[in-house]
Amino acid sequence: MSATPIGFFGLKLVPGKVHRMDVSRDFKITNVSYADQPKSNTKTLVKIHYTHVPGFEDDYDEEEQEKEPKSTDEEEEIEEKVYTLCSLNGANKDHAVVDLQFCQEELIGFSITGDAPVDLVGNYVAPPDFFDQDPSDSELYSDDEDDDEDMYGLDSDDFDDDDDDDMDEDPDRFEELVESSASKPKKAIEAAPLADSKKRAAEKPVKETAAKKLKADASAASAASTPTKAIETKGEKQTKGAKDTKPKSETVEKKTVDKSTSKMTTTKLPSGLVIEEKSAGSGPPCKAGQKVGMRYVGKLTNGKVFDQCTSGKPFYFKLGKGEVIKGWDEGVKGMRVGAERRLTCPPKLAYGNQKIPGIPANSTLVFDVKLVEIK
């Protein structure tokens, strides 16, 4: 599938200078020409300066290689190489049509020989799709994760059935279940455990109040000769039960609200991506070239879930290599293990005008993501 153009790219090259590129977005060069009318005897070579970064190569045996450290002689050095893109001359070839695409984070530069400036023009392009096949509608909307393929090409055989039993099936949230001390309050992110604790907290005061009421009624029956005292006792117990119940409920709600709001920070990047920080995580931040393992829930803006990976084997990809949509490459960068974010990706950082099963064209996508591993 050819890359989808999403914007104009242009660069003017002047003699005697190497134009270094900070490749923040994928782009393609389609035409090379003189910037002005050249002299008939003008000759120009357009050069590409490319630096290979060893950490960016596709390597599926990283863990085994880490166990066997390389010797000094085997370590790969970073070296810049220069290649010729095309040649121009003022007599009969003042432009060249090319088709050359560069990916985000590549270390490249351009230079020219001769004394005539040259224009490079082309397009910024959308990153390639990060799944190989279009899943069917039934697969996208199936609730049984053991029978479907997620949109990233992970087969159900890759998932561990034992892990499925340990994960919360709520499609809106996800969480690695961890044992915690009973004296510490649950985090607001743990949706299912918190709901159960709220339910128990609500049921307990009701049961206590009912028991106290029955006890007060029994006291009133046995002390019929002194009705005034029985009534006072009953009233005091009911009042005390109400006072005991109210602070508990308010405390649980207050802690939940405080935790959910105090950790929420929102940032909007120039690209239009909105990042909501929900949990900071710990350890070093992830960076381009590293393989990261993710949990996620993908939704449309109307709340409809189109894909998720909340249990079993995490979804792995190499950050900054265009293996996922642009919104993920930008939004996951800098996360730490355990960190959680909500990424709101405008169409240009998702699938643009492509129509995908379950995702209409020009859709804004919302992802709740959690980083669980950095390799």
Curated annotation (Swiss-Prot):
Name the GO cellular-component terms.
chromatin; nucleolus
List, as start-end ranges, the regions of compositional bias called Basic and acidic residues. 196-216, 231-261
Reactions mediated catalytically: [protein]-peptidylproline (omega=180) = [protein]-peptidylproline (omega=0)
- State one molecular function term (GO): peptidyl-prolyl cis-trans isomerase activity
Q: How is its activity regulated?
A: Inhibited by both FK506 and rapamycin.
* Predominant location: nucleus
Bias (Low complexity) ranges: 217-230
Q: Where in the cell is it found?
A: Nucleus
List residues of the PPIase FKBP-type domain: 289-375
> Keyword set for this entry?
Chaperone, Isomerase, Nucleus, Rotamase
What the entry lists under InterPro entries is as follows:
NPL, PPIase_dom_sf, PPIase_FKBP_dom, PPIase_Fpr3/Fpr4-like
Q: Which domain of life is it from?
A: Eukaryota
Its Enzyme Commission number? 5.2.1.8
* Positions of region (Disordered): 55-78, 127-265
Amino acid composition bias (Acidic residues), ranges on this chain: 56-66, 131-173
* Family the UniProt entry places it in: Belongs to the FKBP-type PPIase family. FKBP3/4 subfamily.
Q: How does it assemble?
A: Binds to histones H3 and H4.
Function in brief? PPIase that acts as a histone chaperone. Histone proline isomerase that increases the rate of cis-trans isomerization at prolines on the histone H3 N-terminal tail. Proline isomerization influences H3 methylation thereby regulating gene expression.
Q: What protein name is recorded for this chain?
A: FK506-binding protein 4
